[in-house]
Every structure is written in C-alpha cells, then in structure tokens.
C-alpha cells in the first residue's frame, strides 16, 4: 500500500503542516510526530474529503489556525524574556522546503540545507554514498540526506526544457518578416553540382576582400536582384537526408542538377525520392549545355518517368538549361529560385531568441569546437548562451561566410561560432537560453535522456508490431523501400504493395531501385521510418551495421508473393513469426579447385561469425543471391570439422553447386524458432 508524507499532503490541501498534524491527531487519532511522518493513502483520502473546501471544513481549519496563532503569540512573549540569541526549541516552525533539480552538487546541497559541507558528506557516507564536495548526486540521494535534517525536498520542474523550446508556437503574425530562402543542390556524381555552386558563388557572392576569397563554412549567401539567397554547400542528398533523420527540415528549395548529355542516373533517382519524401519543391538545372551531346528534351522525357513533368510540357516543375562552365542561364536559374521561394511566402520573427540547425561542425586544433549554425528564427547574438543537441556553450566569437567577425545574425543566415563545450552533430537543433547554467543543465538532461533511450526498445516500425501500432493510431502510413536484382521485380513489387492500402494505413513505396541494399537506403529508411525489402539481393556490411544502429528493419525474400503476404498479414494482425533467420557467419572465396567425381571445392576465409557443417548457405555474387543450398563438407587442412570461426581459413563444398568463383561471399544461416507474439 502506498504512503504519503504529511508535508506533501499539506501542500496539496494548501494548509499549514501544523494544522494538518493537529487534525490528524485530534480528528482521526493518527499518530504523527512531525511533518516528515508518513500516513496511509486511505487516511489521506479521508482527510481530503474532510478538508475539501466546504464552509464547515474551512471553519475547522480556521479554528486550528487560531489555536496555533495563540501558541505562537505565547511563545513570542516568552522569547522576549530570554537572553538574546536563544531559541524556542518547543516552537516548531513551519515546514522547511527546498527545491532542487534532477542533480545537485554536494556543495550546493549543503548551502541549501544551511549545513556545513563536512556534515553533509558524513551523512552521505552513512547512506552508503561516497561523494566529494563538487561531485553531483541525484535527486533520490539528496532527498535521503535532507530527510536526516528533517527538510522536505521537491524536484524542481525545469523552467525551460528543450522540448518546450522546440514546440514554441506563440508566433505573433505582425512580427513576422520575409526571410531569405535556403537552397540545397543535389544530383548524380559528376553531373556538375560543385561546378554549379562555384559558378553561382563566383558570379554572385559579395566580395569583401581582394580576390573574392571566401572561407568554407558549409553554407554561403548570394545577392540576386537585391534579395539574399542562402546555399547549403553540403555533399549531396546523403547529408540532406541525415539531417532530416535528426528532425532538421532546413531546406526550402532543392536544385536538382542533371547533366544534359547523361540524363537521369541512379543517384538522380535517389535525390528525387529524397525530395519527395521531404516534400520540398524542386527546380531542375539541366547542366552541361555547352557539350556537343547535350539533349535537354531527353532529360525532360526521363523526368516524366519519375513523376516530374516540366512546365514546357504542361507540368509544374521548373527546368532551366544551364552551363556551369560558361555561366549560361545562371541568372535565370537564380531568378527561378527566387520565384519559387516567393510562392512559399517564407517568413520568420527576427525579434525573438534564435533557433536553428547545425550545418557542419569540427574540432579545430587552435579554436576548439567550431560549428556552422544556420539561424532559422530569431536573431543570434555574440555572448548568447545556447543548447545544441546534447552540448552547450556561450558564443565567444561569430563569423560570416566571408570570414568576417560579426556580432549578430538574423533568420536564414549561416554563421561559424566558437565557444561550444563539445563538437555537435550535423542536423542538431540549437536554441538560445537565458544563461549558461540553464544550457548546461538542459544538455546534461538531454544526455541522460539519450542514454536511457539507447537502452529502450526501438520504436521504428516493423512488421511484427505494425498491426498494434495501427490500432494505437501511431502509424497512418507504411513507407517501404524496395531493392531487387532486376527492374521488373521492382515495378511488380511497387504495384502490388500499393494495392494493399486500406482506410487505416496507406502503403507507400518511397524508393525503388536495382542493386544490393546500401547504407544510403538505410539512411533514407531511418529518416522516413520505413521498412527495407530486398528481392534476391542482400545488404552490404555497411548497410547491416547502419540498420542495427538506426533500428531499421530489413526483410529479404526470394518470392514476391511471400513479401506481399507478410505485409498483408501484418496489417490485419495475423503475422505469425514462428521462425527467425539468424546469420551464423560469412566467408569469402579465395581459391577454387575442381576435383573429378567430387565437384568444385572452395578455399575460403571466414570473415564474420562462423561456418557450421550442414548449415544452410547462400552464395552471393556482387550483392546478388545466385544460389541457396547447404554446406556439403567443411575441412580445416585435411581434417573434417564441425565449424570454423572468423579469422581462419577452411575448405568446403556447397551441395548441388559447382559454379563457385573467387570473390563470392558464402553466408551461413539457421532458422531459429522464436516465441509467438500476440498482436
């Protein structure tokens, strides 16, 4: 049965602790010694009924208060007759209450208790805690110490939590003013992203130094027709998606660069899907128009195959033919960016405390932690205290994109700052707080929260818990990434999955492509809370590590029907995961030997885990599964063995398969029975 302390109940009922003690003893016959005594919840409930606001009960409280007042007056008269400095030990003062945060140093606790530090340390030792004067202790430990001194402790609610800052919605419409748009450039490798950025920078960056030398801080601003544009100089869509995975939606417009002589390429498709998933408007820059084989109409045709119809052909996608080399139509492209941003009516309040996102960060040998911050709302000033993810600091110096020292930066302006305690991660949100102590406390709270979340079960969507999440209303849309060995399979799967959509949940294929499952696929899945499905393909080592780190579910199949049935069963709550595939180990083929009447024997090196004789195996060539069978034999030197661990060489043969080649990967796995889950 739970209990409550007298002072806690007194605070809840808004009556003095002494009044409550008298009521307990006189009216209920409950023996209590002082405000730290505990009473049963049943007694507390009865007292709440008695003292819950009626006039009679108010009179009862007033009666006891009058008696107490008389006692106090009598005690005061006696006190005058005593020597100066003596105390009335018989008069119990009202409850002494202190408030502390989730943690407090021993020195601060001693000051709050008004006790010598040595006494507090001794009390800590008696409670089994060894702590030095500047060491932090948690709230529970501080409460035990305070209890020894008969002092009540309340846990102070953080005045400003990061979540409250993030969720601030009290926007005054009249304070909003136009802000510059933030642009990211994406596209396939070698299609001219960097060249285009350089062309824009050279033609439009306002030079403040001889030669127009600018400092690379990951972002820069340009002037177009009196308007400012902010460009993020990030390495393609990987950084864009990594930021989005951390909750940082900072881009207003995306320039998709497509080479006029090359057309749509795999990374172009990825970039298109990333933009669609983020719901960010796109402008297509058809680059390399100076080349002989340039064919913009072919690019426009290929764009339509991915749901992007340009304005020339009756669509709403702006396409501008440009040349980064000759700077042809660069001005037109920038004007189109301005037009697109004007349609969005981008606004921010420059008068409030600054909030924004980390674009990039590094540890500089001479300057310490250096971060490029993009202000998204408010104005950032030198000397401001900020919380950035799980780090904090006070801005000691601030530089613009030309390396010039500045004192403040408004919305959509990138700045490089010094003064952070640690190097933050790209995509971390920053918020200005009232002082450095508040920032430190919030950073510590965030670190503790991250530590606890690392032990908690991942809340990423998975087939096993999909139905229950749908019922709870936490999943309205199931996002899927499809990878297969041939394009026909990708199209068939996309069509079949999208037909499964119901009123409760919509199935959406956000990306489909040919090839092995890569780390980029996992990053997109993490950002979009998606499931990755592979057909006759496997994830590479980086993808496996990323999926485990980010909690992304990767499912692989050999038969399309099985995948459709799995997702369908999950949606109706009938998925029955009786067996789970467990990868035992992988080995790389380094030599092959053909032996008459036996077949092909492979010499391999075990990369991870172990190979077990008679285990199920799959042969993987360039990321694609080409055969599934069993290990027919397993030898170490000339001896038959049951298993070979990672780091050792071995010889083996695969049952009914002789087309083994050097460089093939053998993946051994087993199907383990797992306990059935109720969905």
Curated annotation (Swiss-Prot):
Keyword Iron-sulfur annotated: no
SUPFAM superfamilies registered for this protein in UniProt: Initiation factor IF2/eIF5b, domain 3, P-loop containing nucleoside triphosphate hydrolases, Translation proteins
Region (G2): 212-216
Region of interest: G5: 323-325
InterPro entries xrefs: EF-G-like_DII, EFTu-like_2, IF2_II, IF2_N, P-loop_NTPase, Small_GTP-bd, T_Tr_GTP-bd_dom, TF_IF2_bacterial-like
Domain tr-type G span(s) in chain numbering: 178-347
Stated name of the protein: Translation initiation factor IF-2
GO cellular component: cytosol
Keywords from the UniProt entry: Cytoplasm, GTP-binding, Initiation factor, Nucleotide-binding, Protein biosynthesis
Function: One of the essential components for the initiation of protein synthesis. Protects formylmethionyl-tRNA from spontaneous hydrolysis and promotes its binding to the 30S ribosomal subunits. Also involved in the hydrolysis of GTP during the formation of the 70S ribosomal complex.
Stretches the record annotates as G4: 287-290
Region annotated G3, chain positions: 233-236
Gene Ontology MF terms in the entry: GTP binding; GTPase activity; translation initiation factor activity
Domain of life: Bacteria
Family from the record: Belongs to the TRAFAC class translation factor GTPase superfamily. Classic translation factor GTPase family. IF-2 subfamily.
Residues that hold GTP according to the record: 187-194, 233-237, 287-290
Sequence segments annotated as region (G1): 187-194
Location(s) in or outside the cell: Cytoplasm
């Amino acid at each position: 049965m739970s209990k409550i302390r007298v002072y806690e109940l007194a605070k809840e009922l808004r009556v003095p602790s002494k009044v409550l003690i008298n009521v307990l003893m006189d009216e209920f016959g409950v023996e209590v010694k002082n405000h730290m005594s505990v009473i049963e919840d049943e007694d507390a409930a009865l007292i709440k009924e008695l003292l819950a606001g009626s006039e009679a009960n108010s009179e009862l409280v007033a009666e006891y208060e009058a008696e107490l007042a008389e006692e106090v007056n009598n005690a005061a008269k006696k006190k005058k007759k005593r020597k100066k400095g003596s105390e009335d030990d018989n008069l119990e003062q009202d409850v002494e209450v202190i408030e502390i945060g989730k943690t407090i140093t021993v020195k601060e606790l001693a000051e709050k208790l008004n006790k010598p530090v040595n006494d507090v340390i001794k009390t800590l030792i008696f409670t089994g805690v060894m702590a030095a004067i500047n060491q932090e202790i948690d709230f529970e430990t501080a409460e035990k110490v305070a209890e020894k001194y008969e002092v009540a402790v309340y846990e102070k609610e953080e005045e400003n939590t990061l979540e409250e800052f993030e969720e601030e919605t009290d926007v005054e419409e009249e304070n909003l003013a136009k802000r510059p748009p933030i642009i990211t450039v994406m596209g396939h490798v070698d299609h001219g992203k960097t060249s285009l950025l350089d062309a824009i920078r050279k033609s439009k960056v306002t030079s403040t130094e001889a030669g127009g030398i600018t400092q690379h801080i990951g972002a820069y601003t340009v002037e177009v027709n009196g308007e400012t544009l902010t460009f993020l100089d990030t390495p393609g869509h990987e950084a864009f998606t990594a930021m989005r995975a951390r909750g940082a939606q900072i881009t207003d417009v995306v320039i998709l660069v497509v080479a006029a002589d090359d057309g749509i390429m795999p990374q172009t498709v990825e970039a298109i899907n990333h933009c669609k998933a983020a719901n960010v408007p796109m402008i297509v820059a058809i680059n390399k128009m100076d080349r002989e084989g340039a064919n913009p109409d072919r690019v426009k045709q290929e764009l339509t195959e991915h749901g992007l119809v340009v304005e020339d052909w009756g669509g709403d996608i702006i396409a501008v033919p440009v040349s980064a080399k000759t700077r042809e139509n660069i001005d037109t492209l920038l004007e189109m960016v301005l037009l697109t941003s004007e349609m969005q009516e981008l606004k921010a309040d420059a008068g409030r405390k600054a909030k924004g996102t980390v674009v990039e960060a590094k540890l500089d040998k001479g300057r310490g932690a250096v971060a490029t911050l993009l202000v998204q709302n408010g104005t950032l000033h030198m000397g401001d205290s900020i919380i950035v993810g799980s780090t904090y600091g006070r801005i000691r110096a601030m530089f613009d994109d030309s390396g010039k020292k500045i004192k403040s930066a408004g919305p959509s302006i990138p700045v490089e700052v010094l003064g952070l305690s640690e190097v933050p991660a790209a995509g971390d949100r920053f918020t200005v707080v009232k002082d450095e102590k508040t920032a430190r406390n919030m950073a510590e709270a965030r670190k503790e929260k991250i530590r606890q979340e690392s032990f908690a079960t991942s809340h990423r969507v998975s087939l096993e818990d999909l139905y229950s999440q749908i019922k709870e209303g936490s999943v309205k849309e199931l996002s899927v990434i499809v990878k297969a060995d041939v394009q026909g399979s990708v199209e068939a799967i996309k069509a079949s999955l999208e037909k499964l959509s119901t009123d409760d949940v919509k199935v959406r294929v956000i990306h489909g492509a040919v090839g092995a499952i890569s780390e980029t696929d996992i990053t997109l899945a993490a950002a979009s809370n998606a499931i990755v499905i592979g057909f006759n393909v496997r994830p590479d080592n980086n993808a496996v590590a990323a999926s485990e780190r980010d909690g992304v579910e990767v499912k692989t199949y050999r038969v399309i029907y099985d995948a459709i049935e799995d997702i369908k069963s999950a949606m109706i709550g009938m998925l029955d995961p009786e067996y789970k595939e467990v990868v035992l180990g992988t080995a790389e083929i380094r030599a092959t030997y053909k032996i008459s009447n036996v077949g092909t024997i492979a010499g391999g090196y075990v990369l991870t885990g172990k190979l077990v004789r008679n285990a199920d195996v799959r042969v993987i060539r360039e990321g694609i599964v080409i055969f599934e069978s069993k290990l027919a034999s397993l030898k170490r030197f000339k001896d038959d063995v049951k298993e070979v661990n990672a780091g050792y060489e071995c010889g083996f043969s695969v049952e009914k398969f002789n087309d083994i080649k050097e460089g093939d990967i053998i993946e051994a796995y087993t199907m383990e029975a797992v306990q059935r889950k109720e969905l």
